[in-house]
Swiss-Prot record:
This is Conglutin-7. PANTHER family: 2S SEED STORAGE PROTEIN 1-RELATED. The hydroxyproline modifications determined by mass spectrometry are probably 4-hydroxyproline as determined for other extracellular plant proteins. Residues 1-21 form the signal peptide. Disulfide bonds join 33-116, 45-103, 104-152, 118-160. Gene3D superfamilies: Plant lipid-transfer and hydrophobic proteins. Residues 77-98 have a biased composition (Basic and acidic residues). The lineage of its organism: Eukaryota, Viridiplantae, Streptophyta, Embryophyta, Tracheophyta. Induction: Repressed by water stress.
Length: 172
């Protein structure tokens, strides 16, 4: 009976020690993640996604035969265009691909921590939620945001709640 008591006491001690160590490990992970998020520059991700949404709206929301869309029209004259805007002939937009590359470099820092990757995606959503116009644009932004890790060749978080303007959450 004494041996059984000692074994039970030892088992409880080991269980408590394991729980304490796990809690300490998770706390360190939270601090590490918070530090990574503070150092990360997620602005290129936000810019890439907003440009992508804008391009999609431009290509789906307008008449392709409209004179304002004609790359040969005077309004599209290269001498009159803003030199920093993407070329009308470049369907992807050079600025966006630069933003995507910089974004992927930043997201790569979170690849080994799926929870932290999710928090980075949540931060991007929160930063841009005020700029999104209407439910349709918000949903499109979320779709693009969910696909962002895969576009960068990274694993996407298995479960991640994305904050929505109404205060609820969308889970994917």
């Amino acid at each position: 009976m004494a041996k059984l008591t000692i074994l039970v006491a030892l088992a409880l001690f080991l269980l408590a020690a394991h729980a304490s160590a796990r809690q300490q490990w998770e706390l360190q992970g939270d601090r590490r993640c918070q530090s990574q998020l503070e150092r990360a520059n997620l602005r290129p991700c936000e810019q890439h996604l907003m440009q992508k949404i804008q391009r999609d709206e431009d290509s789906y929301g307008r008449d392709p035969y409209s004179p304002s869309q004609d790359p040969y029209s005077p309004s599209q004259d290269p001498d009159r265009r803003d030199p920093y805007s993407p070329s009308p002939y470049d369907r992807r937009g050079a600025g966006s691909s630069q933003h995507q590359e910089r974004c992927c470099n930043e997201l790569n820092e979170f690849e080994n921590n799926q929870r932290c990757m999710c928090e980075a995606l949540q931060q991007i959503m929160e930063n841009q939620s005020d700029r999104l116009q209407g439910r349709q644009q918000e949903q499109q932004f979320k779709r693009e945001l969910r696909n962002l890790p895969q576009q960068c060749g990274l694993r996407a978080p298995q479960r991640c709640d994305l904050e929505v303007e109404s205060g609820g959450r969308d889970r994917y």
